[in-house]
């Protein structure tokens, strides 16, 4: 199961969602987070949840630097610096952001790469 959220604070809601998914038969849970803040004791809560098998990986962006979470086996950081740079440049030049935000081509390539030949 793939979960996506815009922001992770303490992670309580996300952890409850993972727990519910596992209780209902989910085999592997992967979460993608745009702004992984990991506030308060969130990292230790996710350490415990990972040990309990509630999720496989958390994928977060480097929009928020979290040195401690980068050490975790369960965390994958995705570099979005280029996207930010392109966004700033286009805004400065009063150009459209639509093509930056349209992921249909990327998703199509990923799906076709995973499709076995007939």
Predicted regions, residues:
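PRPP-associated nucleotide enzymes
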Residues: 1-118
């Amino acid at each position: 199961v793939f979960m996506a959220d815009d922001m992770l604070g303490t992670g309580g809601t996300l952890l409850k969602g993972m727990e519910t998914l596992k209780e209902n038969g989910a085999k592997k849970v992967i979460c993608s987070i745009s702004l992984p803040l990991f506030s308060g004791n969130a990292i230790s809560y996710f350490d415990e949840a990972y040990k309990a098998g509630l999720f496989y990986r958390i994928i977060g962006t480097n929009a928020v630097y979290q040195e401690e979470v980068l050490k975790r086996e369960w965390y994958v950081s995705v570099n979005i610096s280029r996207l930010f740079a392109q966004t700033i440049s286009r805004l400065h030049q009063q150009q459209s952001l639509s093509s930056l935000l349209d992921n249909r081509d990327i998703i199509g390539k990923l799906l076709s790469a995973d499709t076995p030949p007939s």
